[in-house]
Amino acid sequence: AETDPVRKAEILQIAKNLEVVPAHAPQTYWQAIQLYWFTHLAVTTELNPWDAFSPGRMDQHLIKYYEADTEAGILDDEKALELLECLWVKFYNQPAPVKVGITLKESATYTDFANINTGGVTPTGENGVNAVSYLILDCMDDMKLVQPNSNVTISKKTPQRFLRRAC
């Protein structure tokens, strides 16, 4: 049994999260992060996606959970960043599944080239930069890993602060 009370609490929270995701929609930022990982595993394991899979606009997907949890007082930026960094480590350590078919013939890589986009615009055309966008930039800086690949999407609506921070 785990004797470190902090680690024990983390493990218990992970177990509680598993009662929700992936069978149900996430209710918290942490659950949303876990769902991202499960979705990534499912796609890369089942679909053999030509060495690349983009989980999409992570900042856009996570912002509602981040805002709800920070407003409820159950999440701060330090914990939000830590959870992103844990996900980054998972992406980095996840080799792609065994290649088959044309993918086997054309590729000799062992990584799955996850690609994270941040910034850009929302589906309604508004500025898409949000608090999670900045956390993703912090994560990229802190982790300095070659995977997941990370892109910054810019538009005329992108704040100068975000552009400077991304560079």
Located regions from the model:
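Conserved catalytic cores of very large enzyme subunits
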Residues: 6-13, 17-167
